[in-house]
């Protein structure tokens, strides 16, 4: 097992590059199953556990996958299996993305119900309902989604998502791209990763209108073609690094980033007193000595993202006043709060709202990661804490942050990765 050891109290400064988006990469990797021949090549793919998990899943169903130096190539002409097994899907919820491409191209799929971060219910019913509306027969059996189409394959349909869902929107887009007729999606997700998936599919030959709006119209085509493409930036990694600068009262510049993807996040940094400037591909943040409190409501894009909620709670422990953070997307996503309180935070949770009382001096301690973004929040707190903080079980972190400790060290953080024996007996003194 590995942990991160952090000696806090040092302001961050310098320049660092932002990695390619994990969430975008996973979606377009699944889309690479749609062409019947050739090789799709994707640049700027982050070297993450989730990327390797999906790569292995694609290999199991027969795709040829090569990953080297942040470039991923996928040849899907020889797919011979249509099952995504539990052993892989349990590791990552995004594995369900193969459902739409397999159904759209082959008319059949067997996908284990997914795993991933454990913070409350995140049902897959929207995915299943959409596939049924496109004409698939679906049953749940022995922990699997078993889906088949009629002889004619999928057919276009009108689908109104009752809640905005990135995963369901992406999966339905990929299935509808090869369906017969026209599919209309309403209340579709607006996230940059969905916009980029639409553009990626269009480049493959799909016909999609309404890109960047909540209403998407997909005219099915007979065939899609392999392409070469560059992945977009990871806006959540960017937001996390900016929060690291703010919580340490530092000054950093991020490069290879699209500020337009972080509009709501940047507005909140300005609200707490940070100076923020941008170019087309860079963001500079300078934090004040005294941070102001800020209330946040996590909502679907373009509002403040739920994937920054945990980091914002950590940051608000160092703001001068009371902040309230409401999560309207994942209402039970507060596993990080008890661990932040172990470091000295004063945070209470009621229903889907956390109330943070700052400024609270933080002190180093051992804390336990419970999920991906919780891990990031504990690192931020450790950077601000007096003394040494040990963040255990950082395998959660490795699902979504590429060498985050190296990037933080480049900015001056005193942070290192160590191995430890989780079951070792403590030494009594």
UniProtKB/Swiss-Prot annotation:
Signal peptide: none annotated. Keywords: Cell cycle, Cell division, Cell shape, Cell wall biogenesis/degradation, Cytoplasm, Peptidoglycan synthesis, Pyruvate, Transferase. GO terms for biological process: cell division; cell wall organization; peptidoglycan biosynthetic process; regulation of cell shape; UDP-N-acetylgalactosamine biosynthetic process. It is found in: Cytoplasm. Pathway: Cell wall biogenesis; peptidoglycan biosynthesis. Phosphoenolpyruvate binds at residues 22-23. The modification 2-(S-cysteinyl)pyruvic acid O-phosphothioketal is found at residue 117. It catalyses: phosphoenolpyruvate + UDP-N-acetyl-alpha-D-glucosamine = UDP-N-acetyl-3-O-(1-carboxyvinyl)-alpha-D-glucosamine + phosphate. Pfam families: EPSP_synthase. Its EC number is 2.5.1.7. The active site is at residue 117. It is an enzyme of class 2 (transferase). InterPro entries: Enolpyruvate_Tfrase_dom, Enolpyruvate_Tfrase_sf, MurA_subfamily, RNA3'P_cycl/enolpyr_Trfase_a/b, UDP_GlcNAc_COvinyl_MurA. GO terms for cellular component: cytoplasm. Its main location: cytoplasm. GO terms for molecular function: UDP-N-acetylglucosamine 1-carboxyvinyltransferase activity. Belongs to the EPSP synthase family. MurA subfamily. Cell wall formation. Adds enolpyruvyl to UDP-N-acetylglucosamine. PANTHER family: UDP-N-ACETYLGLUCOSAMINE 1-CARBOXYVINYLTRANSFERASE (PTHR43783:SF1). NCBIfam families: murA, PRK09369.1. This is UDP-N-acetylglucosamine 1-carboxyvinyltransferase. It comes from Chloroherpeton thalassium (strain ATCC 35110 / GB-78).
